[in-house]
């Protein structure tokens, strides 16, 4: 029976393998999708303009609120930009309640967000209540969901991702809902900029890094997405609508589905059971929200078909989303039977041998490795197709996978070398810590400057 189990795991590992040639095809396909998205709206890659035309230099100063609405948490921040790439920050963080983020009505989540902002203002800026509008606190709002952005302050939600489902908000300006929530509480706040977290990561990396050639910002967290700097003359859909030589573009690449990359049985089962089945396929291969669930479904299959754990299903394994990606992160610290047993001890598995434990490590590793290899595709595609080949280039990244998943960036770089050869050495990849907060403040500063004619 153990021999059959070993063969089953080997097949699973093979199913999650993407060879170099498949990745090269994906690089070409990604660029074709990018070009279509720059031509017109409504394409697979949204290629949404951020209405930010320049990157910060590191010299920027100012005090701003930032509100970060991500896939798991809500953060309210007060940020002081000190210049020289430095900043100070105060913040509070709250977990998004399930009853608010899966609700027909938008009111519960707006009430939740507005109430937390009110508590933050009462704690840190009580004297601001009742001040004239010209003294309101400027805020940058990070809204990390696919949206049609029509100005620096207007962003219309296209669809929910990361497990959220609030139908009333679809095709609506979410920031306007927030503004109404603030007004109902007489909060002294003015939203100056609405950005995506990838744009925040990009501008934060440009602000804090000593590198002068930052061109991408990428999120590898609950979901995945990227932003980059594009030349205005390469964006036909903005012809005559914007000034300046460049535009920051939020790509919304989580929606990509490469025809050249196959889906495993576990991918198909996972996708079927998500609120947005058939969509965000790339994100469901790479996002931290999904890797643990893919592993859980693999374990379920091994128990059911190959009698792993004596065919017994621990209650924690039968529930969807019960195995988080942090479990895989802990497993990847060391390939040893002892480590696997310790990490999976809460699931009460009965291992027949140390080898069986190592087989599970191999299965988990294959899922994470595929995610890292797929993550190299957009980087390689943009590097090759935007005139940067042969040049030093800097990429800012943020999110739980690059921070906490062992060797994720190493595996990404391995695939990058396969795709662009020695050029991989010219690409620096660095953490843009607090990109969603600092980036929102930087974009709010840019918006205020433009409003005053100072940009």
UniProtKB/Swiss-Prot annotation:
Keywords: ATP-binding, Glycolysis, Kinase, Nucleotide-binding, Transferase
Residue ranges of the region described as Hexokinase large subdomain: 196-434
Domain Hexokinase span(s) in chain numbering: 3-445
Record-linked Gene3D superfamilies: 3.30.420.40, 3.40.367.20
GO biological process: canonical glycolysis; glucose 6-phosphate metabolic process; glucose metabolic process; glycolytic process; intracellular glucose homeostasis
Pathways per UniProt: Carbohydrate metabolism; hexose metabolism; Carbohydrate degradation; glycolysis; D-glyceraldehyde 3-phosphate and glycerone phosphate from D-glucose: step 1/4
Region (Hexokinase small subdomain): 57-195
GO cellular component: cytosol; mitochondrion
Binding site for ATP: 68-73, 222, 288-289, 325-329, 400-404
Catalytic activity: a D-hexose + ATP = a D-hexose 6-phosphate + ADP + H(+); D-mannose + ATP = D-mannose 6-phosphate + ADP + H(+); D-fructose + ATP = D-fructose 6-phosphate + ADP + H(+); D-glucose + ATP = D-glucose 6-phosphate + ADP + H(+)
Residues in the signal sequence: none
Entry annotated with the keyword Transferase: yes
Keyword Nucleotide-binding: yes
Pfam families per record: Hexokinase_1, Hexokinase_2
InterPro entries membership: ATPase_NBD, Hexokinase, Hexokinase_BS, Hexokinase_C, Hexokinase_N
Annotated substrate binding sites: 144-145, 161-162, 196-197, 225, 252, 283
EC number: 2.7.1.1
GO molecular function terms noted in the UniProt entry: ATP binding; D-glucose binding; fructokinase activity; glucokinase activity; mannokinase activity
Family: Belongs to the hexokinase family.
Subunit and interaction comment: Monomer.
Function text: Catalyzes the phosphorylation of hexose (six-carbon sugars) to hexose 6-phosphate. Phosphorylates D-glucose, D-fructose and D-mannose. Compared to hxk1, has a much higher affinity for D-glucose. Constitutes the initial enzyme of glycolysis by catalyzing the phosphorylation of glucose to D-glucose 6-phosphate.
Protein name per UniProt: Hexokinase-2
Organism: Schizosaccharomyces pombe (strain 972 / ATCC 24843)
